[in-house]
Amino acid sequence: MNRKTIKTICLSFLVILIVFYPPKIDALSHDWIAVPKSKYGQQLWDKNSVQKNENGFIRVLSKFIPKSTTEITQDILYTMDVNCSGKSFRDVAVGTKEFNEFKNEDSAWKDPNGDKLILGVIDQVCAFIN
């Protein structure tokens, strides 16, 4: 094989790679909705992520932004299930850099126990879905 043939093969391979391997892009951008703030920070939920699963529970992406952020206290990203009839929730996964970074294997249903931020998410998400 001569140089021209090798060059043609390499360029053809590069073109095929570019055409058939598009960059990863998120299908939907986030549409963050804030719940009333608390003394600890702010909680938001993503309107574009709301899904009703086969059990009738609602899955939503949520983000907690602490009042003051440092290397130790930073934004926390949650994938959470909401039980509208029971006013309860469970954290399915959590992360700091991306959603679903760490799966929660023991995701038991929890009572918000008066937490205004979580209650705000539950109330708003349930009103949005109905």
Task: State where each predicted segment sits.
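A general, composition-driven signal for non-globular sequence regions
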Residues: 1, 17-18, 31
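N-terminal secretory-pathway/extracellular module detecting exported/lumenal segments
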Residues: 23-78, 83-130
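Bacterial N-terminal signal peptides that target proteins for export
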Residues: 2-10
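Bacterial N-terminal signal peptides
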Residues: 11-20
